[in-house]
């Protein structure tokens, strides 16, 4: 369960929800579940422009990361184009789906819970110790950072959940 309330009324604060935004790209031949890099790029660009946060301040991103041959490269491409072009430090990326699978309508809440718990414990991924072959070509020119063993606390977090 996630309880959202005003900070002044909270007994304990685990995380703050600064801004939210969503979009939909279901008007295409392949259907709503087929990912589209351009639509994801637009969502990320609009999000950071509207909430007035520089993507360079982002330390960690909890991605949708379904582990599919089509979805992961599309999502990584959008993340790279919007969040990584001017970075001087690596952007750490994670996904809960490598531990629990895709929980369909609850996947966004699972991602939020994972990151909040990670701020305290940072549990390693159960299955993903190497980058899957479907994204190796895309990441060939990138530094790959395995965050499974990184236990540092991060302050700037972002969740992406697109369908």
Placement of each model-derived feature along the sequence:
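Condensing-enzyme catalytic core of the thiolase-fold
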Residues: 1-163
